[in-house]
Every structure is written in structure tokens, then in C-alpha cells.
A protein has these predicted regions:
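Bacterial N-terminal signal peptides
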Residues: 5-17
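Metallo-beta-lactamase
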Residues: 23-29, 35, 119-186, 267-289
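Conserved beta-strand hairpin/beta-sheet module of binuclear metal-dependent hydrolase folds
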Residues: 25-82, 171-192
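Pre-active-site segment of Zn-dependent metallo-hydrolases
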Residues: 47-95, 105-108, 160-164, 197-206
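Active-site neighborhood of phospho(di)ester-bond hydrolases with catalytic His/Asp-centered motifs
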Residues: 51-52, 89-98, 118-121, 188-194, ...
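Active-site environment of divalent metal-dependent phosphoester hydrolases
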Residues: 56-58, 98-103, 125-127, 143-144, ...
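Active-site HxH/HxHxD metal-binding segment of metal-dependent hydrolases
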Residues: 60-62, 81-143, 156-159
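Cap/insert and terminal regions of metallo-dependent hydrolase folds
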Residues: 75, 195-283
Length: 289
């Protein structure tokens, strides 16, 4: 059994911060651990889900072409601890999509081939099966895994104007978000690589999540003055729609094309007096809800 006390002991031994926040139903078994970039471990009791693993060492890949600061190599920082700790106790992996900063060759190599892998569509499933993964599952609208209900939410990886331009539209591709629910535990909405859309608004209204994970690095491609994911102002939008929810801001300080850093977002949060609602975890930090 994956006892919470053992998990906390591990956190303390590694010198990694663990913070507790009230969100939704009383619970001591729901947590989100920020790993790096968009990689996170979501724990519901004895179930541990790994989202969007990018596991390479610092500087393993060239910067994304035709993007902001493309001269930098990715990832721009190391993992906060070794890959063995990242994969410890993981029961399944979920991919919002298969861009390099969410699913990379290191993850392909290091994740066990029998691991349950949840993906958004057949193209991503075929990609993983081609790498030898034996238990690849295409997510329907709703599915239950080990007592956790996972629902898909539509996402849009850039503006409507960007999707009018080829080959950019093909490069951006399709993405999904997830809602995680379990009886007696807080509901978590992980929006994924998306800009603000009616689907995001609809998911917040429909599911009334207690915790909302936003990718707020405001990544930019050349030729456009808006991002392909959310930025600082989206934290205000989400807070206005879900004022009691805890917002967890990630996908910063790890790949070349992010234009918003944690420091930038902290300044914005202070200016807007959102400190009690917007959480900005460091790599390796665990947030308990």
C-alpha cells in the first residue's frame, strides 16, 4: 500500500517542499507534484497518475524552430530528482498530446512497456504502440481507472488565426485536457496546452473543479503576438469564473518558447491580490489538497 506517511517521509528526505491547501471535500490523500514543465504526478489515495512525462536531461534537444528564444536547448533545466523517483509508484501515464515537451524520447525509453498509457486518439495510440507499449488506451469521453473517473475536455493549442495557417495548424495539432474525479476527493481539472476557449469555460462550469491546473507559460511562435497556451491574465479569468478553486500554474521555466516565468506570474498574482488562489509550485514541490 502507498501510505501517505511514507510519501511525506520521502519528500522530507529529498528536501522537497510539501504544501497543504484546503480545496473541496476534506482529504489527506489528494496531491499534485510538479515535476518539471507540464509533467506532474496526481495522487488520489493509492492511485498515482503521471501526466505528460518529459524526462530528458537538461539541453538534450534543440530549441523549437520558429519560436521565441529558439537558440536555447530544451529542457532548459534538469529534473528535480532522478527518473526513478519520477516513476516511483506510478499506476498509469496520461498524455494530453505528444509534442516533445510533453512526451519525449527519454520517456519512451524509460517508462515500462506494460504501463497503462492513456492517449487522446488513434494517431497517438499508434505512435506509442509502434514504440512497443502494450497497454495503450484511447480515452473516451469518460472512463474510470482504479476508482478515478477521467473525463476528456477539448483544448485548443493556439488562436483561431493560427489554425488558419499551414503548416502551423498541423504542427499545433490536437490536444486534450482532463478532469479527474473520485468520491470524497477534490475534483481536478487539468486544462493542458490550450488558450482560453468556450470549452475551457464550459468545463469549469460543468465540473466545478476544486483544483484547476493551467499551463501559463504563454509560449510563442514567430509571426503572432498571442500565445499558443495560456498566460498571466488567464489566471484572473479562471479565478473570476471559479473564485473558490485553487489554481495551480505550471509549464514555465523549462522550455525555450515560454515568455512567462514563475517570477513574472508571481508579480502579477501579487498585483491582482490572487496569492490565496493561485499556486505556483517549484519543480519537485508537492501540493496537498
Amino acid at each position: 500500500m502507498k501510505l501517505l506517511s511514507l510519501a511525506l517521509a520521502t519528500v522530507l528526505a529529498l528536501g522537497i517542499q510539501a504544501s497543504s491547501y484546503a480545496a473541496g471535500p476534506a482529504s489527506t490523500t489528494t496531491s499534485i507534484q510538479q515535476i518539471r514543465n507540464a509533467t506532474a504526478k496526481i495522487t488520489y489515495g493509492d492511485t498515482v497518475l503521471l501526466v505528460d512525462p518529459m524526462l530528458a536531461a537538461k539541453g538534450a534537444y534543440p530549441g523549437f524552430p520558429d519560436t521565441y528564444r529558439s537558440e536555447l536547448r530544451n529542457p532548459t533545466v534538469e529534473l528535480p530528482f532522478d527518473v526513478g523517483q519520477v516513476l516511483k509508484d506510478v499506476d498509469a501515464v496520461l498524455l494530453t498530446h505528444t509534442h516533445l515537451d510533453h512526451w519525449d524520447p527519454a520517456a519512451e525509453t524509460l517508462i515500462p512497456r506494460q504501463m497503462p498509457m492513456f492517449v487522446q486518439h488513434e494517431a497517438d495510440a499508434a505512435l506509442l504502440r509502434g514504440k512497443g507499449f502494450a497497454d495503450v488506451r484511447i480515452l473516451p469521453a469518460h472512463v474510470t481507472f482504479d476508482g478515478v473517473t477521467i473525463s476528456r475536455v477539448a483544448a485548443q493549442h493556439g488562436s483561431a488565426a493560427m489554425f488558419q495557417v499551414e503548416p502551423l495548424a498541423t504542427m499545433l495539432g490536437s490536444v486534450t485536457g482532463f478532469v479527474f474525479q473520485k468520491t470524497g476527493e477534490p475534483t481536478i481539472y487539468l486544462a493542458g496546452d490550450t488558450v482560453w476557449t468556450g470549452d475551457v469555460r464550459g468545463a469549469i462550469k460543468r465540473y466545478a473543479p476544486d483544483v484547476i491546473v493551467l499551463n501559463t507559460g504563454d509560449a510563442r511562435v514567430k509571426g503572432f503576438d498571442t500565445g499558443i497556451i495560456m498566460g498571466v491574465e488567464d489566471t484572473s479569468r479562471v479565478h473570476a469564473l471559479a473564485p473558490t478553486a485553487k489554481i495551480v500554474a505550471v509549464h514555465m521555466d523549462a522550455v525555450n518558447h515560454m515568455t512567462v516565468s514563475r517570477a513574472d506570474l508571481r508579480r502579477y498574482v501579487r498585483e491582482k491580490a490572487l496569492q490565496d488562489s493561485v499556486l505556483i509550485p517549484e519543480d519537485g514541490e508537492t501540493l496537498n489538497f
